[in-house]
């Protein structure tokens, strides 16, 4: 099988040297992602496209799906690459490929040609289109808005029969821009802003301020691992967790109620800037949107920015919440965000929307900054690839099984869309569907006399959720890995 990777248009307008660098980086990213599925595949770069060739037909859908999630790719074409002799040979091959698709439909033929031939692209379009119209009685030519467009590409003595076109996410290849550190909370905003910077070519590291204990960190790890695994797995990134409960405690004890929200955000920026400096990261990324909450007015954002020289990027600054939620739904983080608790908003009852710098600084003089230095120094830094491995260690008390007993029920915890696309069926065994984001509220409603075997496709989510349920006191859970 063969895929043709078409570049994001902004790459094609770069200077020759920059364009070549971007294409080289994108080629490497594609190799890094796809080697997990097929180590024998070939990735070949050209001036205006990249070819991916693989032998294992069983991996076709997996490879195609992975390609559509790599930043820098505008769209991919799944093609059948065959030799041809003349225009009539092109027509005959097109007839075999497209006959079933054109039955009872309107169609047109569109051809791209490169190389030396005694015919033009329009000649091929007319010849093939006329032939298909004659040989498929129920089909009809329609040049504007047809039901089916027959795409053909002629390259020297090769004919590319395009079997399907699939849109990519666009943007720049990861690694073409410098690294950033995303302040991730697991909510709608931080997940989307992280995705937007990945799509723009940045390697995104994650910094999490833990305000809610182990369960909160597990949830945010899930989001960060999901984003990395889905859109950024071509590169290694860090996940830095900072226990911010001592900082919140100091703020609650010593800071005036109205100033708490702004001062908490200033402390977060201070801490994140120290982490960014430690690892040579150029900018911070936040999910703040103008006017969304009290700390996100222009006055307050300016005061928050003042505590650090590090550049702070806010890709969602002009977005409304509905737009952000729609983007979260598109990239797959909506379900995580809906069940993620929001801790920042509960610490201040009457937050100021227009903080005064002198008042903020006066309040901060009461704060013991050694606490902030200590939590940053003790921050837990892990390679995001180790999150799954650490989960295995953390869930060591949760048994992993590969078969089922008479009292066992398999619990499919994938999202609803995944369950509908690939329903899980195990002969002779009950399978119950309960998406992972409903486990915290709905698992207790299940029959607790049964043993529940949590299952997801790759096993990461099931282990994380098993740990969470064990922490909640449910001992009748295991991880199912057939």
From Swiss-Prot:
Keywords: ATP-binding, Cytoplasm, Disulfide bond, Nucleotide-binding, Redox-active center, RNA-binding, Thiamine biosynthesis, Transferase, tRNA-binding
Catalytic center residues: 456 (cysteine persulfide intermediate)
Gene Ontology terms for molecular function: ATP binding; CCA tRNA nucleotidyltransferase activity; tRNA binding; tRNA-uracil-4 sulfurtransferase activity
Residue numbers binding ATP: 183-184, 265, 287, 296
Catalytic activity: [ThiI sulfur-carrier protein]-S-sulfanyl-L-cysteine + a uridine in tRNA + 2 reduced [2Fe-2S]-[ferredoxin] + ATP + H(+) = [ThiI sulfur-carrier protein]-L-cysteine + a 4-thiouridine in tRNA + 2 oxidized [2Fe-2S]-[ferredoxin] + AMP + diphosphate; [ThiS sulfur-carrier protein]-C-terminal Gly-Gly-AMP + S-sulfanyl-L-cysteinyl-[cysteine desulfurase] + AH2 = [ThiS sulfur-carrier protein]-C-terminal-Gly-aminoethanethioate + L-cysteinyl-[cysteine desulfurase] + A + AMP + 2 H(+)
Coiled-coil residues: none
Segments forming domain Rhodanese: 404-482
Residues of the THUMP domain: 61-165
Residues making up the signal peptide according to the UniProt record: none
Pathway in which this enzyme or protein is active: Cofactor biosynthesis; thiamine diphosphate biosynthesis
Stored SMART domains: THUMP
Pfam families: ThiI, ThiI_fer, THUMP
Presence of the UniProt keyword RNA-binding in the record: yes
Physiological role: Catalyzes the ATP-dependent transfer of a sulfur to tRNA to produce 4-thiouridine in position 8 of tRNAs, which functions as a near-UV photosensor. Also catalyzes the transfer of sulfur to the sulfur carrier protein ThiS, forming ThiS-thiocarboxylate. This is a step in the synthesis of thiazole, in the thiamine biosynthesis pathway. The sulfur is donated as persulfide by IscS.
Family: Belongs to the ThiI family.
Protein name as catalogued: tRNA sulfurtransferase
């Amino acid at each position: 099988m063969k895929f043709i990777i078409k570049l994001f248009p902004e790459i094609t307008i770069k200077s020759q040297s920059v364009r070549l660098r971007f294409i080289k980086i994108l080629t490497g990213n594609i190799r890094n992602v796809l080697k997990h599925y097929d180590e024998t595949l070939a990735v070949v770069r050209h001036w205006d496209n990249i070819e991916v060739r693989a032998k294992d037909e069983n991996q076709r859908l997996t490879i195609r799906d992975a390609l559509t999630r790599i930043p820098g790719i505008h769209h991919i074409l799944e093609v059948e690459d065959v030799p041809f002799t003349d225009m009539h040979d092109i027509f005959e091959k097109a007839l075999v490929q497209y006959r079933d698709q054109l039955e009872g439909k309107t169609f047109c033929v569109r051809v791209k040609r490169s190389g030396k031939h005694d015919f033009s692209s329009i000649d091929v379009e007319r010849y093939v289109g006329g032939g298909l119209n004659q040989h498929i009685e129920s089909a009809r030519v329609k040049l504007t808005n047809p039901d089916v467009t027959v795409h053909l590409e002629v390259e020297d003595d090769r004919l590319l029969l395009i079997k399907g076109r699939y849109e990519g996410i666009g943007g720049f290849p990861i690694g073409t821009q410098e690294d950033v550190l995303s302040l991730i909370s697991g909510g709608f905003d931080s997940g989307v802003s992280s995705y937007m910077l990945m799509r723009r070519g940045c390697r995104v590291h994650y910094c999490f301020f833990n305000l809610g204990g182990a369960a909160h960190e597990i949830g945010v790890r899930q989001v960060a691992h999901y984003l990395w695994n889905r859109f950024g797995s071509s590169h290694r990134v860090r996940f830095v967790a900072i226990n911010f409960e001592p900082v919140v405690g100091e703020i609650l004890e010593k800071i005036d109620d109205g100033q708490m929200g702004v001062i908490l955000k200033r402390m977060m920026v201070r801490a994140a800037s120290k982490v960014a400096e430690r690892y040579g990261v150029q900018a911070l990324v936040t999910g703040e949107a103008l006017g969304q909450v009290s700390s996100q007015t222009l006055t307050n954002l300016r005061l928050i920015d003042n505590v650090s020289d590090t550049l702070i990027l806010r890709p969602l600054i002009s977005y409304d919440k509905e737009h952000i939620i729609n983007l979260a739904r598109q990239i797959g983080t909506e379900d995580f965000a809906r069940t993620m608790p929001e801790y920042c908003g509960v610490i201040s009852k009457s937050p100021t929307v227009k903080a005064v710098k002198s008042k903020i600084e006066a309040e901060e003089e009461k704060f013991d900054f050694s606490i902030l230095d200590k939590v940053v120094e003790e921050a837990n830094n892990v390679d995001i690839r180790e999150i799954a491995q650490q989960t295995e260690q953390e869930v060591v008390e949760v048994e992993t099984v590969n078969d089922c007993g008479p009292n066992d029920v398999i619990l499919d915890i994938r999202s609803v869309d995944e369950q509908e696309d690939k329903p899980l069926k195990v002969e002779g065994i009950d399978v119950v569907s309960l998406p992972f984001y409903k486990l915290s509220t709905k698992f207790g409603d299940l029959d607790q006399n049964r043993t529940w075997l949590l299952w997801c496709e790759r096993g990461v989510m099931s282990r994380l959720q098993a740990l969470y349920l064990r922490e909640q006191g449910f001992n009748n859970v295991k991880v199912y890995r057939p």
